[in-house]
């Protein structure tokens, strides 16, 4: 090998010197560009020219010791070929002596190769080189491959083996080739030719196939995996005697046939009886047939897409849980579904989910009985449209909308739902027409809507009574307010004349009592704290702002009284009011003058001054309520001027507006005068009539009214 390389380098040097003497043709220059530089192949540093070198400098070819087969046959067109391009004899016009002919050296390597071209060699990068089991060579169109094989096989086998051993050293491959060639075939019970198992094992490990001279070709295991349809071979699967599963797949081919002719023949499918079934049907190997195949055979191809659509196949035009009646409607199955869903009972959920159950049942039936249902489904086109009026989509939607509105307001929706389900089942049987059913359903739903409106539940009667009672109490309190505030803010003047007379008479009696208290008849009872009874200065200021300024008097404050004392004083006050109402009018001027004198004296003496309208405010009476205390009338003494009067703590009461108002106030249990504990209360007017005691004996009624006022 080293001698051959030196000779090639010398030939290249001579060619370069000759080329320098004469100009090179374009073909020769291109050929030189594709020839590897021998100095660069030895080492990149040995070529002194570098990039100016006329030969090819390829790192891949330098690392790859294999020569390019196409280059040796003068037809390598790959400028980046990873194989070596050595100098060829006669390339540069001077034949090299001592180097054997290229064709004689490289032709024998194709003798043992298959006729299958190497895929990687066509791509220009087969790393196996001459050891590849596939064909490395040009794909000649005009030449017959059989003739080339005959020419190659004419050389002696021993000479070929010695040349390969000398050049490439592949003695092991030749030995494996000989072992495969001399393998003895065996015959089984069926009389079929089979390859010896040892021969098969050696063929699996070997990479070089049998030579063509034996008129037999083998396909290696790698080729079996790559090619789905092996060419020029007829496969038959043989098993051991009595075995269910094949031990191995073995290749059989006629020994006297031409392998090239068998290569061009088409691959024949083995019989279905010899194929392993693995407990499956034979048609499963070919794929499952279309579900609508029987329909397509009957020239009903227009429903093929309909059959393949699972969602569209069951219900023709679904709208929520309503749909057109299918052609395969089964009344018995429908009633079974109704019984399953609880349609016979008063169950609304069964009716709601009935559509879902029908759809699910249809899907299962469609998967189990597809051809039968498909045939019956196509018979629907011949049905009369009159039969489908009962399942009209518009009627269903209208009926559903009316039923939903009636169910929302009708308290008898369970009974109505039950009747509606019964009508639905009768329509399924065909006992009632669409028009009668429509009219009855419309009439029943309208009547149910009217019943629902009439029986619409209202608020609780307890709450209504409580609220109305509170409103009445508030109205009564507003009616009992002072006439001054009513005339100033409400503008009601129809009772003003009678009220003025009664107010004048009551003030006279109160001034007499105030003068007696101012002379020294004060209370001996302790006065409570000021925070329990706030000052009434704000009430006096408000009365002055309203324009009703009354004379003032100094009155002592008494404090809280028990309920029995208050009721007793209430009766006495009513008795005193009756006597004052009968007094003549000529005494008014004297009483007013006496009251003004007492008020002037009180302004000089006392520090705590309260207005008469604070406890009376036009009617002469007030009720002070502070945290559960019983109202106390205006014979008291305020604690200080600094206390503030809360507006909600003072309720001005008009006890006597007329005879009806007086009786009303007496029933309400309001008190107007309270006697001092330990002393006897005597009015100036002793001539009074006795009031009806039956209206004031109910203490509990008065306590309840007081609680209502606080609330």
Curated annotation (Swiss-Prot):
Compositionally skewed regions (Basic residues) per UniProt: 428-437
Amino acid composition bias (Acidic residues), ranges on this chain: 648-663, 686-701
Renumbered residue ranges of the record's region Disordered: 1-23, 221-246, 339-376, 405-561, 573-701
Keyword check for Nucleus: no
Bias-annotated ranges (Basic and acidic residues): 364-376, 413-427, 460-509, 585-594
Biased segments, Low complexity type: 1-21
Keyword Zinc-finger: yes
Entry-linked Pfam families: zf-CCCH_2, zf-CCCH_3
Alphabetical list of InterPro entries matching this protein: Znf-CCCH_3, Znf_CCCH, Znf_CCCH_sf
GO molecular function, one term: zinc ion binding
Keywords: DNA-binding, Metal-binding, Repeat, Zinc, Zinc-finger
Zinc finger (C3H1-type) residue numbers: 31-60, 62-88, 112-139
Name of the molecule in the record: Zinc finger CCCH domain-containing protein 32
